[in-house]
C-alpha cells in the first residue's frame, strides 16, 4: 500500500525543516525515486515544499550517529543533502514579523538570529534579568528551559507545593499507538491550581495548542477538568482522542485513504509551569521566564526561546 501511495502523491511538504537531517532528505529522495519509477529525477519528479528557519533549532544527532554523518556530510542540516547538488532550490524569504510588534525587540532578535548581537543588545536583555513577575490568576507565566530534567524538576516541585492530594488520570490506548508518539502522559497527575498547557486545538476555538491555563476544579464523576485560561476564560475540558494513522492508496477509487491503526484518549493538557525550548518551537506565550541554567547545548536554542 505504501508503494502506491508514494507513486501517486504530487507534493511533499516538510515543516520545521531546520530540524531535518541531511541523510533523511537523501533517504526521502531515494525512496521517492524508486517508488515513483523515476530514478532520473530528484525526488522522483515530485514537488517538494520545505518550510522553516535554519536559524531555529538544529537537527538532533546522537554522538554515535555524528561520527558516521561527518564522513558523508559537511553539516547535519538538510541543505547538505547530496540531492540538492542536482537541483536548483527556489528560495522564498518571508519578510513580515507577526509574533512581535516592538521594533526594538524585533531588532535585538534579528541580531541574535544572525549572530551579530552586540553590547547594546545584551544590555537591553539584561534589563529584564531578575525581573519580579506578579503571580496571580490573571498573570500566568511559563518557564522555558533547555534541559528536560530542569523542566520536570520545576513541574514536580510546583505540583507538590499545592495543597491536597494529586489525582491521576489514566489515558487509554486502543490498538497500535507507540509510547514515543504519546502527546501527553498516559498517567496524567494533576491538582486544582496546577498550571497547564493545552496540546491540541479546540474544535470550538476556546483554546489553541499552546494556550496556558490553571486548573480551577476537577469533577471526577463528570470526567471534566475546569480550566481558567490566561485570558480569563473559563473552559470545561473533556478527554480528547488522537489517532495513529497509516495512509494507503485505493486502487479502485484512485484516492489516498486513511487507515486508523490505533488511538490514544486523554485530557489534552500537560503540566506547564515549565516546558523545554524544543517543545516551545512554533508556540506563542505572553509571559515567559527563560532558564538558561547549564547553558544552551544546541544551535538556535537561545533564539527560539527569546522569540
Regions found by a protein language model. Name each.
Residues 1-307:
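Conserved ATP-binding/catalytic motifs of P-loop helicase motor domains
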